[in-house]
Amino acid sequence: MDKLIIKGGKKLAGEVTVSGSKNASLPIFISTILAPAEHEISNVPFLRDINTTIKVLEQLGAKVDGNGNIVKIDTTGVDNFEATYELVKTMRASVLVLGPLLARFGKARVSLPGGCAIGARPINLHLKGLAAMGADINLTHGYVEAKAKQLKGARINFDVSTVGGTEHLMMAAATAKGETILENAAREPEIVDLANVLTKMGARIDGAGTDTIRISGVKELGPVSHRVMPDRIEAGTFMIAAAITGGDIKVRNMQLEHLDALVFKLQDAGVEIINKDNVVRVKGPRKIKGVNIKTRPYPGFPTDMQAQFMALMCLADSASVISENIFENRFMHVSELMRFGADITTEGNTATVKGVKKLSGAPVMATDLRASACLILAGLAADNTTEVSRIYHLDRGYESIEKKLAGLGADIVRVQE
């Protein structure tokens, strides 16, 4: 098992290029099931979750060939409508194959994601939507079994905003009979990217990026060539890396408009952000100001940036309050930040962070993907040496982050424990 060793206290400088979006790539890969053809997806990041998705597609009968950041997917040979627990258990997004398989074959059998409690996770919204489109759904032995001669258009109002549910039903509706209307749809940029892919295939979609999406079903879809959007969470993580170290960096291949909520809060904290010719310059302040945040569905402050922003607030000149309104149990990084000397108290979904003058390097353990990034950021700013273990979480969502940070002047290496 690998770990990262960081010698902190270095101001980051230079340029870094953001990889393609993981959260956009996964549903885009899965959408190719809908069209039996040869597809080409570029700007794909090298990540564990991408490899898992490729294995799922191959298990279903697709041929996948990767060359650098370009992946060719041939789905003409897909002849299996079952996604087994052995693969699905490692990645929750795998359940998105259910709708496309059902649309293509009229039946599908997909394992529930590992540790997924139907009532506690919005997968029930996926199933409710498919049922509204005419699917007969049964849960047996940990699998979702679905049948439908042909999915039919329906009006679906999500109880809560769900990115996966919106993506799932948008794919399923692309070849359904009639019009499907998704109300209270999620508005994330990754949904727009998926809609762009489906539209290139021949789908008729209107309203992606708003809370009402209309999909007029077509008889069939064709091949697609598409470049995945940049990863806005990786971009935001590098912006905070510059801020927390008092650095001065340029970030390439990012779309700043996707991070408005974060940008405003960073500016409130004293960070200077300049966007020129699609290159974003980020200069850390001499003093970090305390700023309150509340996570919200897009275009609000992203929950996937909450942990990283908390690391920044640990060194602020005043207290800040962080409210997590999207996910439960998303303060698991707090106890690890306190090992650096951070002053944080939590109550329910709220954390109060009292800034300290400095952090001190410590051995810490990552608990999830974004917590991994948070601990790295703290380590970059801390005195002395920090060791971050269990970084396999990190490899799910960040492509070679230690190499990119080292390229900015960080003293960071990956070693085997």
Swiss-Prot record:
NCBIfam families: murA, PRK09369.1. InterPro entries: Enolpyruvate_Tfrase_dom (IPR001986), Enolpyruvate_Tfrase_sf (IPR036968), MurA_subfamily (IPR050068), RNA3'P_cycl/enolpyr_Trfase_a/b (IPR013792), UDP_GlcNAc_COvinyl_MurA (IPR005750). It is found in: Cytoplasm. It is an enzyme of class 2 (transferase). Its main location: cytoplasm. One of its GO terms (cellular component) is cytoplasm. Pathway: Cell wall biogenesis; peptidoglycan biosynthesis. It catalyses: phosphoenolpyruvate + UDP-N-acetyl-alpha-D-glucosamine = UDP-N-acetyl-3-O-(1-carboxyvinyl)-alpha-D-glucosamine + phosphate. The active site is at C116 (proton donor). This is UDP-N-acetylglucosamine 1-carboxyvinyltransferase. It comes from Geotalea uraniireducens (strain Rf4). Phosphoenolpyruvate binds at K22, N23. Cell wall formation. Adds enolpyruvyl to UDP-N-acetylglucosamine. GO terms for biological process: cell division; cell wall organization; peptidoglycan biosynthetic process; regulation of cell shape; UDP-N-acetylgalactosamine biosynthetic process. PANTHER family: UDP-N-ACETYLGLUCOSAMINE 1-CARBOXYVINYLTRANSFERASE (PTHR43783:SF1). The keyword Cell wall biogenesis/degradation applies. UDP-N-acetyl-alpha-D-glucosamine binds at R92, D304, I326. Keywords: Cell cycle, Cell division, Cell shape, Cell wall biogenesis/degradation, Cytoplasm, Peptidoglycan synthesis, Pyruvate, Transferase. Its EC number is 2.5.1.7. Pfam families: EPSP_synthase.
